[in-house]
Amino acid sequence: EMSASLVGSEMCIRDSLTMHDFYMIDAKVEEVARALGLSELGLDKDVTELSGGQRTKVLLGKLLLEKPDILLLDEPTNYLDKEHIEWLKRYLQDYENAFILISHDIPFLNSVINVIYHMDNQELNRYTGDYDNFQKVYAVKKAQLEAAYNKQQQEIAELKDFVARNKARVATRNMAMSRQKKLDNMDIIELAAEKPKPEFNFKTARTPGRYIFQTHDLVIGYDEPLSSPLNLEMERGQKIVLTGANGIGKSTLLKSILGLIKPLSGDVEQGDYLEIGYFEQETPAGIETTCLEEIWQEFPGYTQYEVRSALAKCGLTTKHIESKVKVLSGGEQAKVRLCKLINRESNILVLDEPTNHLDVDAKDELKRALMAYKGSILMVCHEPEFYDGLATDVWDCGKWTTRI
């Protein structure tokens, strides 16, 4: 009897191991690492040596290899390049178990989901279909609710008017009381307050010289070179996008051009009369200030009203404005950093993955603002749908890197 029990337990363990690909785990690790662009880094590399985007890929790969019953994915396409997003798309389309996904990448959403849960006015509502279908159904539902609200408001006004005119007269008092009772028992329709939409309008400084920067045999990196010698130049009016896989040195190139880190060799010659606006990929760690204090420190001449107004224009609510920066979501923190940029004159914007974490409305408004911007732009971005129609030039950093 004990032997049969042990055999049964062994079979359960074997089935579980088989289900989780235990007997082909090495091949699975290689497959996921290759698909997420981790193989070229070396799988024996210390995680502490990786960039933020590379670490995110490692965590995502680890999670996918675990094959849980339910996958919880919070903005999984942030830091992923186009080919890696395509692979993740196919993976989720074939995924046998359930997954719950938060994402602002609409093409990605549409390709992998069949149910939307929408948080609206403190209610969670379920919609069947993809995001495009949800938008259509939600628009119809919203229009119907607004029509019902307007009809009810008209009825309420008429009832109140009748009660006011007839409650004092003996002949009509009972009718007035009946109308009042109807008013008291009415289920009032409430419309959700409109979510504040951001407005980004960049201030342009004086016109700079012809060249924004020129590099002369520039080799970027820290301990080891990340690039071959670079001879690049950017002219006034160009809007250049840097593309390429994570960890090949795109952010390092921006910081080298700005003079924030020293190159390993060569030099950068900045142009004349530059007024630079720099957007970092992430909020620096250790910030203890509120949003209000953060902007006030940057613009001490502003009144409190002006600081609040500046933050509100970026789509932040009173609650956000009075909260510490460190407790905000990635998208809200990005809006605080954008607030600093749009309130200072510039003639060159240097943007490191500005769309990471931003919601659809903020992303659309940012693209509009950048297209309207009269200055020059140097931007790292992994979303072609964002920079299409905006960029005058696209530079593939994979052609220069020593990491591939």
Where are the predicted features?
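Intracellular alpha-helical coupling/juxtamembrane segments of multi-pass membrane proteins
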Residues: 137-187
